[in-house]
Amino acid sequence: MRKIDLAIYDDFVSPSYLEAIQSACDPSSTPWYFQGSQSLTDYDDALIEDFGFSIGILPPWQPDQFDDTPIATLIKPLIYRIKDIAKADHILRCRLDMTVLHDRYLHPPHIDIGQPHVACIVYVNDSDGDTVIYDHKTKWAKEYCDTGNLPIRERIAPKAGRMVLFDGNYLHTGYSPSEHQTRILINTVLS
């Protein structure tokens, strides 16, 4: 796997392909599945606002095996392109994530999995609800330090078609949108 610190690619997804993805995951016509925790492995009553919705593309229990659904078939070429850019051997997980209008909620900081990996975000729609990558690398845990004093490595605004690749050991999080109904992204984990 290529050593990746942090890379941001604007207009990574071509306009017509992006439009097809947006149409395929439009919440007014596509079923989304409730997730009690967007950020953490286990649901926590104390973090009741850390909810969102998802659509599985490639589940973590079957690396490199995409679901046999129309939306997974549509997104698969994009994920293979990302895999090639990252020079990754495996796609460990891929899902669509949607957070909804909220009053400036910052989700809990986290890393996605315990093994060394590259994390990838592709924003599907223009929205607010920045992604925050802290200048702090850590190992996977159920809880993380208070980020109040951690320096921010990068703050990235959700822009349709923008792709962010980063070392998955960076502690990171995101905001729910407070000025748009939805913030939709494709979240992929590679090794």
Predicted regions and their residues:
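Non-heme Fe(II)/2-oxoglutarate
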Residues: 1-87
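Catalytic core of non-heme Fe(II) oxygenases with the double-stranded beta-helix
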Residues: 68-191
